[in-house]
């Protein structure tokens, strides 16, 4: 009994002591605070614990009481907390008496004081920035407010103050949280299923059907909140003070203007009926008269008449028409003579054909049956393949795609251009009349003298031979490459265009040999030697410094080609050197030797015979070199060059230079020192170019089996692209006389001769007619015809092949 009485008396004593302690703490705090501010470190309980240490007697008594309370069992304390009715009575009794007033008085007293944490105050003061305004007054810039921790965007007061603790922690407890005073918020009683049904039927005011977990009750919305939601949904202003229908101020129409803005009299068309409207009205009237437009009242009459007027025997009205994109399945082909029950004898198979047909796979057979012969139709047995054929037919209809092919009603003859007959375009070479034999290796190059009497050939055996055209006899031979030198070959050679000089330029590896063969008369040979030797005197007496810089200055194009601005002396020393021949070479007719940096592949003379251009694809910026015979000068016109240079030629009569790289052809003006045009043939790898004698057309050959005709007056793309060779095209040449002929040589061993007429009228396109395909050279190691050259006067064609022979093709 004593134990029970002690347990019952404990809550009262605890409440009284706590109230007395709090009152004493507040009084001490009021006395100590001079500026009506109380700085509290932590919470009020911690401050109370510090005051308890000052009162030793009260502390001893409270320790004894706490020991007595600790002696009580946990079960009794839980029972004390679990008794809701007793606690409610105790709370009501205790807080209704004077102690309740005392606790309330503490909050009243604390309401007028400013409580702030000392640590927070020091942090705020440290983060403050003290500056001055422009007038000198002190200015304090306070730190920014953290929107996550220093503010709250919620307008409603939080009823349940459990913080971030999940509500699932209170599922097994009778309460759902604590209010701001620390009291428990008891879980509201749940009604039965019948009560919930009645609530769903009779909806209370502000019912939303939502459940508020913080309070444990249904969420209700007030009329003001509903009105706010309605305004937001209707996109109306939520502020009642804003009037959306305020009277507007008519700035322009408020004052009536007496005078008109424009006093122009009204035109007559405003009062006359419109002609365009009259046309539209007449168009509608004609449509009504013709019956294309039916008035609404007559439409109903026609529909009623059509109900009773129909074709009784017409069964196709219910069938719908196919869609415009519908493709019907093709019909089965009709049976042939082989499928007859009594076919002719020639349609029947013999024993070998039957055996071969049976051994073949079903997919490889041209027909899936063996023709049979019966004397009469009544002897024909049942067809065993009917089911299989129907199944295959279904597979074809189901799996085979169908496409619609529009038939072109075009006359095939209209697609073929109207070309003249080759018989009307004679003369042109049609047969091989002479074969020049003597070289042991393939002949890479050949050239014919300007007078048309001598043919020069260069071969991989290292020799240069000169032949008499009329007889086919060899008249001159010189060896430029030794037998032990396997790296160098005779790459190219060409006669000087001046027939009075008799100079032959031959290329062997890195050297250029200027030869005057002893086959001409004394005058021509002496003239050629003097022309070459005059350059030595120019070099000896040092007249180079007196001449102007003859470097070709070409503006850089899109591939960053620049002009080399070095002087002539440095240019000659850098790019190549001129040497005099030794005694043996002089006796062989060699008058000068030019040594370059890399292997030279192509050579071409200027029409006057004083300049010639060479191409070294591996020499980089000095790939193109221009040499002057009369001064023994060599210069590189370009400082930089992207791509590999394949060929270079002078214009027939203009001061222009054509340079062909792997993919592009550039035309440079040597007088104005600019890039004139850039041609884009569209080929992967160009091999050779040639210019028409009139200078307005160009031919290019490529290793990807193309022959490209460029009209220089038109665009930069080819006018015609000819693809008639089976392998790489090695050479392409125009006839230099007045004959409109050109030919191309390929590795397929064939030579194609074409007729190409260029008209004076710029509006007329060139006429290209294929004339003849010449074959005769053998293909050795996938190489066929390597070079071509036309006779300067006749319609004769010379060709050099990989079989070690040169051929003359005549009419």
Curated annotation (Swiss-Prot):
Keywords: Nucleus, Repeat, Ribosome biogenesis, rRNA processing, WD repeat. InterPro entries: BOP1/Erb1, BOP1_N_dom, WD40/YVTN_repeat-like_dom_sf, WD40_repeat_CS, WD40_repeat_dom_sf, WD40_rpt. Residues 1-11, 104-121 have a biased composition (Polar residues). Residues 128-138 have a biased composition (Basic and acidic residues). One of its GO terms (molecular function) is large ribosomal subunit rRNA binding. Residues 1-138, 547-566 are annotated as: Disordered. GO terms for biological process: maturation of 5.8S rRNA from tricistronic rRNA transcript (SSU-rRNA, 5.8S rRNA, LSU-rRNA); maturation of LSU-rRNA from tricistronic rRNA transcript (SSU-rRNA, 5.8S rRNA, LSU-rRNA). Residues 27-96 have a biased composition (Acidic residues). The keyword Repeat applies. SUPFAM superfamilies: WD40 repeat-like. Its main location: nucleus. WD repeats lie at residues 438-477, 485-525, 595-637, 640-678, 681-720, 724-764, 780-811. Residues 386-422 are annotated as: Required for interaction with YTM1. It is found in: Nucleus, Nucleolus; Nucleus, Nucleoplasm. GO terms for cellular component: nucleoplasm; PeBoW complex; preribosome, large subunit precursor. The keyword Signal does not apply. Residues 270-386 are annotated as: Required for interaction with NOP7. Belongs to the WD repeat BOP1/ERB1 family. Component of the NOP7 complex, which is required for maturation of the 25S and 5.8S ribosomal RNAs and formation of the 60S ribosome. Component of the NOP7 complex, composed of ERB1, NOP7 and YTM1. The complex is held together by ERB1, which interacts with NOP7 via its N-terminal domain and with YTM1 via a high-affinity interaction between the seven-bladed beta-propeller domains of the 2 proteins. The NOP7 complex associates with the 66S pre-ribosome. This is Ribosome biogenesis protein ERB1.
């Amino acid at each position: 009994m004593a134990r029970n009485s002690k347990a019952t008396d404990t809550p009262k004593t605890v409440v009284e002591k706590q109230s007395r302690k709090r009152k004493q703490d507040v009084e001490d705090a009021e006395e100590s605070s001079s500026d009506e501010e109380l700085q509290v470190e932590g919470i009020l309980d911690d401050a109370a614990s510090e005051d308890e240490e000052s009162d030793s007697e009260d502390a001893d008594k409270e320790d004894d009481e706490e020991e007595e309370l600790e002696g009580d069992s946990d079960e009794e304390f839980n029972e004390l907390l679990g008794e809701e009715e007793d606690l409610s009575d105790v709370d009501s009794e205790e807080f209704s008496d004077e102690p309740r007033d005392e606790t309330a008085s503490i909050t009243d007293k604390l309401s007028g004081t400013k409580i702030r944490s000392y640590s927070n105050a020091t942090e705020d003061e440290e983060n403050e920035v003290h500056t001055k305004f422009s007038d000198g007054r002190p200015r304090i810039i306070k730190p920014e407010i953290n929107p996550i921790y220093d503010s709250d965007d919620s307008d409603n007061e939080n009823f349940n103050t459990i913080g971030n603790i999940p509500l699932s922690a209170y599922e097994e407890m009778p309460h759902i949280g604590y209010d701001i005073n620390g009291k428990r918020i008891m879980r509201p009683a749940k009604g039965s299923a019948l009560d919930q049904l009645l609530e769903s039927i009779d909806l209370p005011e502000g019912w939303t059907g939502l459940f508020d977990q913080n309070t444990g009750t249904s969420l209700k919305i007030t009329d003001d909140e509903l009105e706010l939601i309605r305004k937001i949904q209707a996109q109306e202003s939520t502020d009642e003070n804003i009037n959306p229908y305020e009277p507007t101020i008519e700035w322009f129409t408020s004052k009536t203007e007496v005078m008109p803005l424009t006093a122009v009299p009204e035109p007559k068309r405003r009062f006359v009926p419109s002609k365009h409207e009259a046309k539209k009205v007449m168009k509608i009237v004609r449509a009504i008269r013709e019956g294309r437009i039916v008035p609404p009242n007559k439409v109903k009459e026609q529909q009623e008449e059509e109900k009773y007027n129909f074709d009784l025997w017409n069964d196709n009205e219910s069938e719908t028409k196919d869609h415009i994109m519908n493709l019907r399945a093709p019909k089965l082909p009709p049976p042939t003579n082989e499928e007859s029950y009594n076919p002719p004898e020639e349609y029947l198979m013999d024993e070998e054909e039957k055996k071969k047909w049976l051994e073949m796979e079903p997919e490889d057979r041209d027909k899936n049956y063996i023709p049979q012969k019966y004397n009469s139709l009544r002897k024909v047995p049942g067809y065993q393949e009917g089911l299989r054929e129907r199944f295959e037919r279904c597979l074809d209809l189901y799996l085979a795609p169908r496409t619609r092919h529009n038939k072109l009603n075009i006359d095939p003859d209209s697609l073929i251009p109207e070309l003249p007959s080759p018989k009307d375009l004679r003369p042109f070479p049609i047969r091989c009349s002479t074969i020049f034999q003597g070289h042991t290796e393939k002949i890479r190059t050949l050239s014919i003298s300007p007078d048309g009497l001598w043919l020069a050939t260069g071969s991989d055996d290292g020799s240069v031979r000169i032949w008499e055209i009329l007889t086919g006899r060899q008249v001159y031979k010189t060896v430029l490459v030794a037998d032990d030198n396997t790296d160098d070959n005779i790459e190219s050679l060409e006669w000087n265009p001046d027939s009075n000089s008799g100079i032959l330029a031959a290329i062997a590896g890195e050297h250029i040999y200027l030869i005057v063969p002893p086959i001409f008369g004394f005058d021509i040979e002496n003239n050629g030697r003097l022309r070459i030797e005059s350059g030595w005197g120019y070099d000896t007496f040092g007249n180079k410094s007196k001449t102007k810089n003859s470097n070709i200055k070409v503006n850089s194009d899109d591939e960053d080609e620049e002009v080399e601005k070095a002087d002539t002396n440095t240019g000659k020393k850098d790019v190549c050197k001129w040497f005099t021949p030794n005694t043996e070479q002089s006796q062989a007719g060699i008058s000068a030797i030019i040594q370059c940096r890399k292997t030279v592949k192509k050579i071409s003379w200027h029409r006057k015979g004083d300049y010639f251009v060479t191409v070294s694809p591996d020499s980089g910026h000095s790939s193109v070199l221009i040499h002057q015979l009369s001064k023994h000068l060599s210069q590189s016109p370009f400082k930089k060059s992207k791509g590999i240079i394949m060929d270079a030629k002078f214009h027939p009569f203009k001061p222009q230079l054509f340079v062909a790289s792997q993919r592009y052809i550039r035309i440079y003006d040597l007088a104005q020192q600019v890039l004139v045009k850039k041609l884009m043939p569209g080929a992967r790898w160009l091999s050779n170019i040639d210019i028409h004698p009139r200078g307005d057309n160009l031919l290019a050959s490529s290793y990807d089996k193309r022959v490209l005709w460029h009209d220089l007056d038109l665009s930069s793309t080819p006018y015609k692209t000819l693809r008639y060779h089976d392998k790489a095209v090695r050479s392409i040449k125009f006839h230099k006389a007045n004959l409109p002929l050109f030919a191309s040589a390929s590795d397929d061993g064939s030579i194609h001769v074409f007729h190409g007429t260029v008209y004076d009228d710029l509006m007329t396109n060139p006429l290209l007619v294929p004339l003849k395909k010449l074959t005769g050279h053998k293909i050795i190691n996938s190489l066929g015809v390597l070079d071509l050259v036309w006779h300067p006067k006749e319609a004769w064609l010379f060709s050099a092949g990989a079989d070690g022979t040169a051929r003359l093709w005549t009419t």
